[in-house]
């Protein structure tokens, strides 16, 4: 607002000029959100996959019944804002045996509540913690629409790693990096994912978003925070710059030299994971916001494209 306070309530009916193809966001070295998601739909068309596009509002209103129509569900690059009904649908879909591919980072992070009578209106409170552009004033952390505590889902006991196996760990808006395969990728349960990819091959050192498949915002594998113990760590990013910083909700003290950037902080990384879920379901997630920007490199003939195509064909 003009007085400097944050906007907690908004509507999709108002013009949103940065939600259009080819818009370059001021934070990103390339594309962001909707226009970055078009990298994925372009790739799906190029590889002749049949697909439907559904919105967050569709999922909120229809729930898991919507997802149950599909053997495999993919997210876009930045599914940051989720309602309680959306999280419940994602979780139930996995329990039902659905195959889920989480292709973003910083997912399922902020509590988002639709107006009970008008789904065109949504409320998001930026609470006392989180990587955020503004902070609600004291006493204004609870939602007006349902009275429940707002802010981060982890504050309500639903940290993203319990939904998608990964948790938001770092962000930086300069250049993107690449992955190196981890020992789990060579196990019989996982090696098929890397058909056509060498054991020592660098993965994703190219792309339209920052020049690499691991960038902008990153998620990590963390058993302490709820990553399933049956999850396989397939690959891990490396060589991030010192402008890639750990998320501030995990910075306990602002002590000089204690928390560093990408060259010295082990929490600054993207982790690629795969695991089985009940009823013959499974989940794959590369843990990076810029991942889909690498799919079209070299006329779609590259190791990022190969990995996702192999995974999707199996699912």
Question: For each predicted feature, which ranges?
Answer:
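Aromatic-Pro/Gly-enriched surface loop or interdomain linker
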Residues: 1-67, 309
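Loop/turn elements at helix/coil->beta-strand transitions in domains of secreted/extracellular proteins
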Residues: 46-52, 68-72, 95-100, 228-230, ...
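Generic beta-strand/beta-sheet core signal
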Residues: 54, 75-76, 103-104, 236, ...
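Short alpha-beta junction capping motif
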Residues: 67-115, 311-314
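Glycine-rich, aromatic-lined ligand/substrate-binding cores of catalytic
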Residues: 118-306, 310, 314
């Amino acid at each position: 607002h003009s007085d400097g306070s944050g906007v907690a309530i908004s509507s999709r009916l108002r013009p949103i000029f940065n939600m259009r193809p080819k818009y370059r966001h001021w934070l990103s070295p390339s594309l962001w959100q909707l226009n970055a998601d078009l990298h994925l739909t372009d790739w799906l068309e190029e590889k002749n996959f049949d697909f439907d596009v559904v919105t967050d509002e569709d999922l909120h209103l229809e729930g898991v019944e919507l997802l149950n129509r599909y053997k495999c569900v993919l997210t876009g690059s930045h599914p940051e804002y989720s309602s309680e009904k959306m999280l419940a649908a994602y979780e139930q879909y996995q329990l039902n045996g659905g195959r889920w591919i989480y292709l973003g980072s910083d997912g399922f992070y902020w509590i988002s509540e639709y107006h009970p009578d008008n789904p065109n209106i949504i409320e998001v409170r930026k609470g006392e913690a989180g990587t955020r552009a503004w902070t609600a004033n004291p006493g204004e952390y609870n939602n007006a629409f349902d009275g429940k505590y707002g802010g981060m889902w982890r504050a309500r006991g639903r940290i993203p790693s319990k939904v998608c196996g990964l948790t938001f760990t770092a962000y930086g808006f300069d250049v993107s990096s690449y992955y190196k395969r981890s020992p789990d990728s060579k196990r019989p349960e996982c090696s098929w994912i890397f058909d056509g990819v060498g054991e020592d091959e660098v993965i994703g050192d190219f792309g339209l978003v920052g020049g690499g498949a691991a960038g902008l915002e990153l998620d990590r594998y963390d058993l302490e925070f709820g990553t399933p113990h049956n999850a396989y760590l397939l690959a891990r990013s490396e060589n991030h710059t010192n402008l890639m910083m750990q998320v501030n909700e995990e910075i306990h003290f602002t002590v000089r030299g204690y928390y560093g950037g990408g060259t010295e902080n082990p929490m600054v990384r993207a982790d690629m994971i795969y695991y089985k879920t009940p009823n013959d379901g499974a989940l794959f997630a590369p843990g990076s916001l810029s991942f889909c920007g690498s799919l079209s490199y070299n006329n779609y003939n590259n190791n990022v494209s190969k990995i996702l195509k192999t995974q999707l064909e199996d699912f």
